[in-house]
């Protein structure tokens, strides 16, 4: 409920902004700190998240499909590595991405947790390693990371039907599925 009206908020960055503003925490109200948080939140939403998501797809799910995916996997792993380098450079100057712990760190942290699966040596990014180690011990982060832990399978043992649902849909097939649901 926003201003007394029911409303859904979607997209991770928008959700984090809404919650942080509502709780008055992890999102500064004054410039230039606010803009710095927004820069790094949008950097995650437009860069780190999508690139890490592509690495995840090609490492965890693409092997279930025929074809050579090595170019794509290498491409996204390299981009993920480059983005960790960007983080490492800024974290050399400050403790957290925007200075103080913020929604920018909250948004970015989950995408760094999979570094081992992506065959990245986090120790080659000393500042990211320090940042990662500081965040992973926060009690709320630990509780959050435990949610759904037993359900994570990273593509192992996933059924063909689930793979089709997750990766072989387009706008037309989704529309047809919605129409079929309406008939029932």
Protein language model features and the residues they cover:
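An acidic site on a long C-lobe helix of protein kinase domains
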Residues: 8-11, 33, 79, 102, ...
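Surface-exposed helix-capping loop/turn segments at secondary-structure junctions
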Residues: 25, 89-100, 139-144
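A non-catalytic, amphipathic alpha-helix used as a structural packing/dimerization or gating element
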Residues: 36, 75-82, 86-89, 127-130
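GST-like domain detector, emphasizing the conserved glutathione-binding G-site
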Residues: 1-74, 88, 174-184
């Amino acid at each position: 409920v926003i201003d007394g009206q029911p409303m859904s908020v979607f997209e991770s960055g928008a959700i984090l902004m809404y919650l942080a503003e509502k709780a008055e925490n992890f999102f500064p109200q004054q410039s230039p700190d606010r803009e710095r948080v927004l820069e790094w939140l949008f950097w995650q939403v437009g860069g780190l998240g999508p690139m890490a998501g592509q690495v995840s797809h090609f490492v965890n799910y693409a092997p279930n499909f025929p074809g050579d995916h090595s170019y794509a996997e290498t491409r996204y792993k390299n981009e993920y590595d480059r983005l960790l380098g960007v983080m490492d450079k800024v974290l050399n100057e400050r403790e957290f991405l925007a200075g103080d712990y913020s929604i920018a760190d909250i948004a970015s942290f989950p995408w760094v947790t999979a570094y081992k699966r992506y065959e990245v040596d986090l120790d080659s990014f000393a500042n990211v390693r320090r940042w990662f180690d500081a965040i992973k011990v926060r009690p709320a982060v630990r509780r959050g990371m435990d949610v759904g832990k037993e359900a994570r399978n990273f593509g192992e043992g996933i059924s063909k039907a689930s793979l089709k649902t997750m990766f072989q849909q387009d706008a037309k097939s989704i529309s047809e599925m919605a129409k079929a649901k309406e008939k029932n």
